[in-house]
Amino acid sequence: MSVSSRIDEALNEAVALATTVGCPPRLAEALHYSVFPGGARVRPRLCLAVAGTCGDDAPALADAAAAAIELLHCASLVHDDLPCFDDAPLRRGKPSVHQAFGERLAVLVGDAMIVLAFQTLARGATAHPERLVPLLLTIGESVGMPLGIAAGQAWECEPRVSLSAYHHAKTGSLFVAACVAGAQAAGADPAPWRGVGEYLGEAYQVADDLRDALCDVDELGKPVQRDAQLGRPSAVEELGVAGAAQRLRDLVAAAVAQVPACPGADNLKALIAGESARILPKGLAGGEV
C-alpha cells in the first residue's frame, strides 16, 4: 500500500469511529470537512518515511502516529482561522470551518480533533503498548506548552518575539514530532531524527512567510498578506525577501545533512528536496529573489 493510501485509510478510520451513531450530525460534518480533502499531508508522510527507514516493524502504530499528527495539524488550522486569531475566510481553497459551520462548531471540532488524535494513537498501539508512552509524550509536547503549537500561537500575543522561537513552536514542533514519532513507532532510537524535524519545520514556516508575502489568494487557497496586516512575526519582515529565501535554502540543506545514515536515507533526502521545491513561491524556484 502506498504512503498516501496508508494515511488516507488511517484518517478515514479515525473519522468514521468519531462520527458513529450518537454524534451530533453537524459536528460530524464539520469533522469530515476539516480533514478531507487534505493538503500535502507532509507531516504524516514524513512520519511514515522515517518509520520506513527505521524498519517499519509496526505499520499499524506508524499509521496511527501519522494520522494523529495530521489530526493535530488540522485542529491547529481550524483554531488558527478563528475570528479571535486570523479571522481567515478561506482555507485550502474553500470556506474556513468557522465560515462554513459557525464559530462555536469550529471551536468544538478543533478541540475534538485534538482528543481524536490521542484516541487514534492509543488504538494503534495495542500490539506495542510499550511504545505508547514515549509517543504520547512526543506528540503531546508538540502541541502544548512550553514549546508546542499552543505556545507558538501565544507568541503572537506577546509584545516582543524571537522569530526562531516562534517558528519552532508554531510550526517546527509538529515536524519534530513527525520525525521522532516515526522512529519511536518503529522501535528505533529517535534522537538522530530530531534535528531533521527542527530544521525542516523552521524551513516550512519561512516558506510560509514568503508565500504569504509573494503569492496570491488563488495560488494559496487562503488569504495573503496576513503577517503584515496582523503584525505577526515574519522572516520576510525581519530578513527581507532575499534574506528569507536564503534562510530557507540554508535550513533545507541543514535538514538534509541531518538525515542519519540508513537504508532509506536517499529516499528521505529526495522527499525533503521535493517538498522544499513544492513550497517555494514560483518566482524563487530557480533561485531568483
Where are these regions (language model features)?
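All-alpha prenyltransferase/terpene-synthase fold signal
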Residues: M1-V289
